[in-house]
Amino acid sequence: MTIQFLKNVKKQSYKGLFLTALACGVVPLQSCENTTTEQKNDVAVQEKPVRAHSITKGRAITNVKDVFKCDVPGWRVTAEGTLVGDDGREWVVPAKSSYQTGLKATDLFNECTGVLLENEDGLAVDEVPIIEIDSDGEVVTGYFFGDNYFEFFVNGKLVTVDPIPYWPFNTSAIRFKAKRPFVMGVKMIDWSENLGLGSELMRGVPFHTGDGGFVAIFKDKGGSVISSTDSSWRVQPYYISPLLDPSCVQADRTSKSCTVPPKSDAESAYGVHWDVPENWGLENFDDGAWQNATLYTNEDIGGSIQRPAYQNFTGLFDNPAHDAEFIWSENLLQDNLVLARKIIE
């Protein structure tokens, strides 16, 4: 069921129309099946159905102006904000993050810290911290490049966070110790300047819809590749914006057909949000409703991979023997918070 039926409902105010539709969860993300009833005066009263999703409209209130600052060309204001959905829930945009408290991954290329390795061979791997998940596990080294920000988990435990949440682009690594089978999880965030509107200033365009993208490769202690980002990863979006009309989002959260608001109405963009499950990083989490990751070429990702933060490490990520693929959900432009997971047997 989609919210398209709203167009066929007449003689209602916009507000009434909107709330009537949402009462049945018809932004097709959830039907009216999840309802409860209670007996009042011998009459069964149907309560308001419980919806998983929430819809927001317009720009967020900025709560944290400077999540990260860096005095180099290309740095962008990195802020966090909040806005309230149609159901009264408050949402952090672009997403709740552990940037302030999480362990920063070890730099391979970071203009803000001055670490500018020419290739991965310059990394002293033995000096990279090992985060222990299992005392009797194997040591794995992960190498990451995200557009824009990532948080990396193993068996639901936060292992490390991207040292730079927005711009400039960077490459990093971490080591962890885990026993198979273990679950690798990644929270991928496409940061934005226009909080709540899912857009940024780009080449003079004030409401440019930026893209995401994430690539990683994992090696054992001997240097052999045990995994890399590919289509076997399972992904699911949890924040979609900017949307001209939230009805475009399908029940499986597909948003490929969604259009972006025109520049003249960009401040009125909609967003659709879902709560992140607490157990999404655990082995027993059911990701059956998730999608397989969509693969993107270097050209799809665009300008970010033209920078030395990526180009210096093509021998690592684009090795023909073990080519790591850029992954995201089906909508590279409007899906701003995407979770990804992979079980290593």
Give the positions of each predicted feature:
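Bacterial signal peptide processing site
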Residues: E33-T35
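Beta-strand-rich recognition domains
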Residues: K40-F150, V154, F169-E345
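N-terminal secretory signal peptides that target proteins for export/translocation
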Residues: M1-Q12
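Compositionally biased non-globular segments, especially hydrophobic aliphatic-rich helices
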Residues: A23-V26, E38-Q39
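Short, solvent-exposed beta-strand-to-loop segments that form ligand-recognition rims
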Residues: V161-Y166
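C-terminal motif of bacterial Sec signal peptides marking the signal peptidase cleavage site
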Residues: P28-S31
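Sec-dependent N-terminal signal peptides
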Residues: Q12-L22
